[in-house]
Amino acid sequence: MIALAFALSAESSEFVSLLAQRSRDDRGVITGAVHGHSVRVFHTGVGQAAAQAVTADFLARHAPALLISSGFTGALDDSLAVGDVLFAANYSTRDLPASLAETVRQGTLASTAAMLDSPVERTQLAARTGAIAVDMETEFIAAECHQRGVALLSLRAISDTPSAPFPLPPAVLFNVARQQTNYPGLLLYLARHPGAIGRLARFTGQVATARRSLATALDRLLRALPHS
């Protein structure tokens, strides 16, 4: 069985639609099949605490041959564009299949405790770590996999870049502590900053682009992976 971890269903929905024989258990784990592989999809939530706890619980209940850490990631420079797909070589313990090498960027991914809100923060993180993209979960998912001897492959799609950043302050977009968007707060922010409405609409398009690219890349990856 191959497991796929996403932070949120907004990241996984297009891939999940590709699965045959879909079912969902009482913990929200989605079971299905694609290209002859049995797969289970679970959602960790956003950030270190959620990713560690949910991944540990999943691995205590299931024994995947491979876990794919997936979802969205932010580019640290504009060499990556929205919709590009990154293979995080520093966290992956399996090689990327050769058939994906021409369409998937390989590089270093950093994981942080908070969303980065400015191009300056992105530049500083890149200089400090050598990373080309950032997320909030993969490092912590990788630690749980390492502890249990589970092979890991990280494949993520770019949803934002220095020139196409988050449209609103991160705390307005998503409350990590509560694992949800505060919609009354979001509406209040937009009422006070109407110019942000257009930016939010553009970002919604960026997310859709990343979701499509990710589903395509995951479909190609699972087609290329050998069957155990």
Q: Where do the protein language model's features map onto the residues?
A:
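Short, conserved "active-site rim" segments that organize catalytic pockets and cofactor/ligand binding
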Residues: 1-19, 85
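Glycine-rich phosphate- or other oxyanion-binding loops that anchor nucleotides, phosphorylated ligands
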Residues: 2, 25-228
